[in-house]
Curated annotation (Swiss-Prot):
One of its GO terms (molecular function) is structural constituent of ribosome. GO terms for biological process: regulation of translation; translation. The gene is rplA. The keyword Transmembrane helix does not apply. Transmembrane segments: none annotated. One of its GO terms (cellular component) is large ribosomal subunit. Belongs to the universal ribosomal protein uL1 family. This is Large ribosomal subunit protein uL1. SUPFAM superfamilies: Ribosomal protein L1 (SSF56808). Keywords: Repressor, Ribonucleoprotein, Ribosomal protein, RNA-binding, rRNA-binding, Translation regulation, tRNA-binding. Binds directly to 23S rRNA. The L1 stalk is quite mobile in the ribosome, and is involved in E site tRNA release. Protein L1 is also a translational repressor protein, it controls the translation of the L11 operon by binding to its mRNA.
Length: 232
């Protein structure tokens, strides 16, 4: 553990904690200071000036990253009739109804995302206590409760990520892997930055984006100069 700690300390020395970096600089530094021996995930964290206790200041949604996440998402679809066949044709990993509800109740979680048609939500809703804490409950805001299962599956497979402000007003979202080129990570970052910026609640007061950091798995945080981020 001491060796890992020294690696992180050495990596952190490359970053000036008092400086704000451009997106390009921050991402390149995050890549350079990744100390783990696997292809780490690169993540962005937004600290927002919102009061999440108020319903009109909740932020939740999804965005398709232009260059994907670098991770293959396993999709479970709850549907009936023709929608079952449509989901299979679109590339869903698991498709069904009651049998998968039972499997989940018994502790099965070999999937990453659930898509459900609206007519299945009465049944899927029974899994709320199990799926909710894991962030797996389908939601219309993230496009995972829909009759257009083909579009939902294609977007997820293409690299759609969900984002949600936690109680402290912080949003975490993956933007790819350390092995990605910096240019691809910047494009993915800008896609997330754009939707979070546009999601500012009308009722939010004061500074909206209080801080924006780039990190890698177990790596140090690099601060981004959010005021000068330009989304083309």
């Amino acid at each position: 553990m001491a060796k890992k700690g020294k690696k992180l300390q050495d990596a952190a020395k490359l970053i000036d904690r008092n400086s704000l970096y451009s997106a390009q600089e921050a991402i390149e530094l995050a890549q350079k200071t990744s100390t783990v021996n696997f292809d780490a995930t690169v993540e962005v964290a937004f600290r927002l000036g919102i009061d999440t206790r108020k319903n009109d200041q909740q932020i939740r949604g999804a965005v398709v990253l232009p260059n994907g996440t670098g991770k293959t998402q396993r999709v479970l679809v709850f549907a009936k009739g023709e929608k079952l066949k449509e989901a299979e044709a679109a590339g869903a990993d698991y498709v069904g109804d009651a049998e998968y509800i039972q499997k989940i109740q018994q502790g099965w979680f070999d999937f990453d995302v659930i898509v459900a048609t609206p007519d299945m939500m009465g049944e899927v809703g029974k899994l709320g206590r199990v799926l909710g804490p894991k962030g797996l409950m389908p939601n219309p805001k993230t496009g995972t409760v829909t009759f257009d299962v083909t579009k939902a599956i294609e977007e997820i497979k293409a690299g759609k990520v969900e984002y949600r402000a936690d109680k402290a007003g912080i949003i975490h979202a993956p933007i790819g892997k350390v092995s990605f080129s910096a240019a691809k990570l910047v494009e993915n970052f800008l896609a997330v930055f754009d939707v979070v910026q546009k999601a500012k609640p009308a009722a939010a007061k004061g500074t909206y984006m209080k801080s924006v950091n780039i990190t890698t798995t177990m790596g140090p945080a690099v601060k981004i100069d959010a005021a000068n981020v330009v989304v083309k």
